[in-house]
Amino acid sequence: MGFLKTCVFRRNACTAVCFWRSQVVQKPSVRKISTTSPRSTVMPAWVIDKYGSNEVLRFTQNMMIPMIHYPNEVIIKVHAASINPIDVNMRSGYGATALNMKRDPLHVKIKGEEFPLTLGRDVSGVVMECGLDVRYFKPGDEVWAAVPPWKQGTLSEFVVVSGNEVSHKPRSLTHTQAASLPYVALTAWSAINKVGGLNDRNCTGKRVLILGASGGVGTFAIQVMKAWDAHVTAVCSQDASELVRKLGADDVIDYKSGNVEAQLKSSKPFDFILDNVGGSTETWALKFLKKWSGATYVTLVTPFLLNMDRLGIADGMLQTGVTVGSKTLKHFWQGVHYRWAFFMASGPCLDDIAELVEAGKIQPVIEKTFPFSKVPEAFLKVERGHARGKTVINVV
């Protein structure tokens, strides 16, 4: 049924990684992992061997099962995963320069050694193995997580993640439902809470505008803003208006029915704007913020990774710094805050999100599910855009 593995860990690494967790579990020093076949050291996975279009996706039965290398890591048996736009972009090589620097800061490896690369950021599954310093989880726990993009992804039978990136799955959700949330939820949480400074204590009555409201990030953002008693205006297409209203949006603007800027002129100013669209949006959106009141515009569409792909690490970071610095200063003098936000993997934040889920304040929004054998079709679905929620992969 399985095999035994004994791992030697770096004793001085991350000894306090789970200080924010209160529950302690006891683990034996040698544990057992159940795999697809007896004595197996390989697993099924979807990988890419080079960057490109959908044809580069390849199914293999021979991907090496991940090993625990640090004492704060856990191995999860993947029950469900999901496809995000970042996965489609990474398949095509987006962000490769910066992500490879994160994978190999000393540039020891030669170019292309990130392959075979497994995509997929979301996971809901069961803990199979725990590092020696993991105290909050034990084998058999049902968990969910979002894996940082520089790590091997979740479109495989097993995935290894840091313990501080993992959270106990909400009991009210199936694995399929749970896999739809972590990446988009943490991205929205980063923008709204960590960067925007909004929370359940200061959000009541705030006027919030969400641009690109019908995708994964937008549908989560609507729900968390309504859970915190904000007034939400959602911008999406007409065919998504019923969805966002069901999620709690107070006002809905159809961007296809006319100029959004013109439609917003009759609205009161906003305290917070979340931009999932980018492009020319920021050239007009900020003027709808309340001036000199602490109002904030946060965009999730930034040139950070593209700059490094195009200019290299040093010049790309310099260009990025100049861009965000100049825009921040420009809008500061106009009485509003301009900010960028990014996905941040965080088990503690997922704990907070799980509480909202269990309280019935957050519902997963799933547009379509695919079996593990249909991963390429799922990528094409996400690549076509116009999402009405998430695309989920049932691995088990």
Swiss-Prot record:
One example of a Gene Ontology biological process annotation: ubiquinone biosynthetic process
Lineage of producing organism: Eukaryota, Metazoa, Chordata, Craniata, Vertebrata
Pfam families linked to this entry: ADH_N, ADH_zinc_N_2
Organism for this UniProt entry: Bos taurus
Domain Enoyl reductase (ER): 52-393
CDD domains assigned to the protein according to its UniProt record, in alphabetical order: RTN4I1
Assembly with partners or alone: Interacts with RTN4, UQCRC1 and UQCRC2.
Protein's recorded name: NAD(P)H oxidoreductase RTN4IP1, mitochondrial
PANTHER family for this protein: ALCOHOL DEHYDROGENASE RELATED, RETICULON-4-INTERACTING PROTEIN 1, MITOCHONDRIAL
Annotated metabolic or biological route of this protein: Cofactor biosynthesis; ubiquinone biosynthesis
Family: Belongs to the zinc-containing alcohol dehydrogenase family. Quinone oxidoreductase subfamily.
